[in-house]
A protein has these predicted regions:
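Beta-hairpin "wing" of winged helix-turn-helix
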Residues: 51-61, 65-67
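Short helix-capping/hinge SLiMs at alpha-helix to coil transitions
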Residues: 18-22, 68-70
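Short alpha-helical segments that sit at the start of domains
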Residues: 1-13
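Basic amphipathic alpha-helical segments that dock to polyanions
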Residues: 44-49
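Key DNA-contact positions within bacterial/archaeal DNA-binding proteins
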Residues: 39
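C-terminal regulatory/oligomerization modules of transcriptional regulators
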Residues: 75, 90-141
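A short alpha-helical element within helix-turn-helix/winged-helix DNA-binding domains
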Residues: 28-35
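Conserved segment of winged-helix/HTH DNA-binding domains
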Residues: 70-94
C-alpha cells in the first residue's frame, strides 16, 4: 500500500514548509522547489488552507506558510485526511465490502497488523518528527 499521489505531494509540501516554518512561499516557488505540477499544486494548497494546515496571506508579499508553533501539533493523519480521507485505511485490502473479523477475506488477518502499524504511524507522527527525521537523513543536526 502506498499513499495516493495527492497525499504524497501534500506531505512533501508540508515537510518543505515545516522546514522553513514561518516563511511564506508562493505556489510558483513551491512548484519550482518541489517539481509538483503548478495547477495541481494550486488546488492542493487551497485544500490544505481550507483544513487549516497552512496559512495563506494575499498580496505582493503573500504566500503559504506553516507556523512553527503548529509543527508539534500537526499529525500526519491530518494531512492524509485533508486530501484523500482516512476511509481507505479501514477498508479491506482486497476491496471486499463485507470483509470483517467474522467474514474475513484471504488477507484479512495478515492485513490487520499492517493496517494497525500504518494507522499508528499516521496518528503518532507530527510535522516536527518529520522535520527532525529529514535533518538527520541529510546529515544536519
Amino acid at each position: 500500500m502506498r499513499f495516493q499521489k495527492t497525499t504524497e505531494y501534500a506531505i512533501r509540501v508540508m515537510v518543505y514548509l515545516a522546514e522553513r516554518a514561518d516563511e511564506r512561499f508562493s505556489v510558483n516557488a513551491l512548484h519550482t522547489a518541489l517539481n509538483i505540477p503548478y495547477k495541481y499544486l494550486g488546488r492542493l494548497m487551497n485544500q490544505l488552507a481550507q483544513k487549516g494546515l497552512v496559512t495563506v496571506a494575499q498580496g505582493k508579499f503573500g504566500g503559504y506558510t506553516v507556523e512553527k508553533k503548529s509543527l508539534a501539533s500537526t499529525y500526519l493523519y491530518q494531512i492524509v485526511d485533508a486530501v484523500e480521507g482516512l476511509e481507505d485505511y479501514d477498508r479491506c485490502i482486497l476491496g471486499f465490502l463485507k470483509c470483517s473479523d467474522e467474514h474475513p477475506c484471504a488477507l484479512h488477518h495478515l492485513w490487520l497488523g499492517i493496517r494497525k502499524q500504518i494507522k499508528d504511524m499516521l496518528y503518532s507522527t507530527t510535522l516536527a518528527d518529520l522535520v527532525q527525521t529529514e535533518h538527520k537523513t541529510n546529515g544536519e543536526s
